[in-house]
Regions:
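Residues forming the flavin
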Residues: 1-532
Length: 532
């Protein structure tokens, strides 16, 4: 079968081919693919429908933060709802279905809700269904309950087994990107008992998504060689496919290891998943950062995704969402995506940079001071409308738009135990609190250090401090030379004047909804989250 959007390179095994189904149609992919990357390679952009308005949705991200491409995996008793296509490893015989639709994915009858969006704004359910009161249990409540939820379950007994267990270590390292790998090397050589956990099946973090070098070798090769070296230590336990899900008292962490989710059927005697309790003396969070979008009119069409995710699909999975791509950015990182895609033969329709002093390029057109004010394409992006500094508008024909509004450190675990994040004007994002969980330190992009050199250095330093507190004598880390260019960024959150600019694409929350909530005094983020 023809994979129209498959590029050269990548970290997939082209010597093998996996067959899989999505909504009853047959497709092919390769070992190393996720369901999302394989669908993009086969030129599938429409993968779901939004919760409230049932608007068409495509892939936005390349990781566990994905709000749109949420599907049902497998069939029969093993049917599993609400699984992110971006984290589901492809395997031979995989069957997936789209969710939250009445009819087909292309012709969802519930999309009629979008026509009544003016009546379904923030807090509408607090203001309606009030009269007559007798209608609530027999009329209103059944309708609301039927509309709620996304996927469905099989109602059959699960044939697989699930386990729980207990682990103990001196240092738990959360995240296996450059900071986590550097920290693990220091800890391994000190003789400490180390656990290195990462939610991905391929350790390396952003090194798997970039094209820069470390010590004259690719970041991918350095990550692979480092993982192999760590495997040689008896005091190191590597845990890929493992999500650290909570920080509890006395250095206890919860972790979910997906032992067999990447297989059609678990191996004999093996559980599908294991819930671990990890007891650790010290912990180091190296969970990286998540790119944030920019809100603009109709920014939710299939084909519009984060620029960093676009780079991940291109460099790691050898996939482009379209053969013609545009970029909308407020920082230099968006230009990296354009450069990488151009090097792989993808046409760059233009880079729209909100900064008047945006860097120029001989590889593609840069629209400095421009803004994306609208998009077109019902089931997939076809054009974007751009406003220029001179007050005029122009149209760019493209099948995909990469959006980059900066990066937010992944500090979720540091906010457990009532830790309060600290705002940083330097990166226009929240950074880890100083009053986080006892024994937990932070390194790398999760700390706000967005260069590879900075991540490596902070990972090694924080590990050294933690080990010395435990009485170990770590040797000085020998770190590879890596890129250390700080990305320039101008904070920019949304395009003024837009009426339907989406902030929460899964739940159909717009900028307008947030403003209305604030106007009605739902200012606290917890109140805002529930009111919208």
């Amino acid at each position: 079968m023809n994979q129209a959007n498959r590029l050269a390179g990548g970290q997939i095994d082209r010597s093998q081919t996996f067959k899989f189904k999505f909504d009853g149609k047959n497709f092919v992919g390769h070992p190393g693919d996720t369901l999302a990357s394989a669908l993009l390679a086969n030129d599938v952009r429409l993968m779901g429908r939004s919760f409230k308005y049932h608007r068409p949705r495509g892939i936005l991200t390349a990781g566990s933060e994905e709000p749109n491409a949420i599907v049902e995996l497998r069939e029969g008793a093993r049917q599993e709802p609400n699984t992110r296509a971006t984290t589901a490893e492809l395997f031979d015989g995989l069957t997936a279905k789209s969710q939250n639709k009445v009819g087909s994915l292309k012709f969802d009858l519930m999309a009629i809700n979008d026509r009544f969006s003016n009546f379904l704004t923030a807090g509408f359910y607090y203001k309606t269904f009030m009269w007559p009161a007798a209608f609530w249990e027999k009329v209103y409540e059944p309708i609301i309950r039927k509309a709620a939820g996304l996927g469905s379950i099989s109602f059959k007994d699960d044939p697989d087994s699930y386990d729980r267990g207990f682990l103990y270590c001196d240092l738990l390292i959360i995240g296996a990107g450059p900071a986590g790998l550097a920290a693990a090397l220091v800890a391994a050589k000190s003789g400490a008992e180390v656990i290195l956990a990462d939610e991905d099946f391929n350790m390396g973090g952003r090194l798997n998504s970039e094209r820069f070098s470390l010590n004259n070798q690719s970041g991918v090769d350095w990550a692979r060689s480092t993982v192999l070296e760590l495997k040689s230590f008896q005091n190191v336990r590597l845990m890929p496919r493992t999500t650290i899900l909570g920080v509890f008292d006395h250095g206890i962490y919860g972790a979910l290891e997906r032992v067999s989710d990447h297989l059609l059927v678990p191996q004999a005697g093996k559980p599908r998943q294991i819930l671990w309790q990890i007891y650790t003396k010290r912990s180091l969070l190296c969970a990286g950062a998540t790119e944030r979008p920019i809100a603009f009119e109709n920014n939710d069409r299939p084909g519009i995704m984060l620029a960093g995710a676009m780079r991940s699909y291109a460099n790691r999975w050898a996939v482009t969402p379209s053969q013609s791509v545009a970029i909308f950015t407020n920082n230099d990182d968006g230009h990296k995506t354009a450069i990488d895609l151009k090097a792989l033969g993808v046409n760059i329709a233009g880079v729209v940079d909100i900064r008047l002093d945006a860097p120029d390029s001989d590889l593609y057109e840069v629209i400095a001071g421009g803004q994306v004010v609208n998009t077109n394409g019902r089931l997939g992006l076809t054009t974007v409308t751009v406003s220029t500094p001179n007050g005029k508008t122009r149209s760019l024909a493209c099948g995909a738009l990469g959006v980059s509004g900066g990066w937010n450190p992944n500090i979720h675990l540091t906010s457990h135990h009532r830790g309060r994040p600290v705002w940083s004007d330097d990166i226009a994002a929240f950074c880890p609190p100083t009053d986080g969980p006892a024994g937990l330190s932070v390194a790398g992009a999760a700390l706000g250090s967005f260069t590879t050199a900075g991540a490596l250095s902070s990972g090694a330093k924080k590990a050294t401090v933690a080990l010395e507190e435990l009485g170990f004598k770590p040797t000085k880390a020998v770190l590879p030379e890596a890129e250390g260019t700080i990305t320039k960024m101008t904070p920019f959150w949304y395009v003024e004047g837009c009426s339907r600019a989406w902030l929460d694409q899964q739940n159909d929350v717009t900028v307008k909804d947030v403003k209305l909530s604030h106007q009605e005094n739902f200012v606290s983020v917890e109140h805002l989250k529930r009111y919208t």
